[in-house]
Amino acid sequence: MRAAVLHGPRDIRMETRALLAPGPAEAVVQVFASGLCGTDYRIWNGDRAVQYPLIMGHEFIGEVVAVGSDVQALQPGQKVAVEPNYSCGLCALCREGNRNLCLSRTAIGIDVNG
């Protein structure tokens, strides 16, 4: 796959990367389009700490190309808009419906590769 990989502030490079198989509860999405927002700019500019190298992109749409063994809600070929945040689902904030405020939240394209 082709990926825009950030190696440091203002150092983004197009690279070919191996397509990883999904874990049991994961899906692989072929990205058709990705938006750029203020968070992306701050990461690219070095104003927000991330671990390099990072495949950026957290606002995207695409098509499911593979699913893990535990995934039942998605199928290959399905078009999707992605919610990039993983929350714990267990803390008080998550239980109150505020999963976006979870202190254990991880975001695709920010905390882990997009």
Predicted regions and their residues:
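Short structural boundary motif marking the start of a folded domain
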Residues: M1-A4
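Short polar catalytic/cofactor-binding loops
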Residues: H7-R10, S34-L36
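Short N-terminal binding/cap micro-motifs at the start of the first secondary-structure element
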Residues: D11-M14, T39
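Glycine-rich beta-strand-centered segment in the early N-terminal region that forms part
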Residues: L20-G35, W44-R95, N100, V112
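An N-cap/entry alpha-helix motif that binds or orients negatively charged groups
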Residues: L103
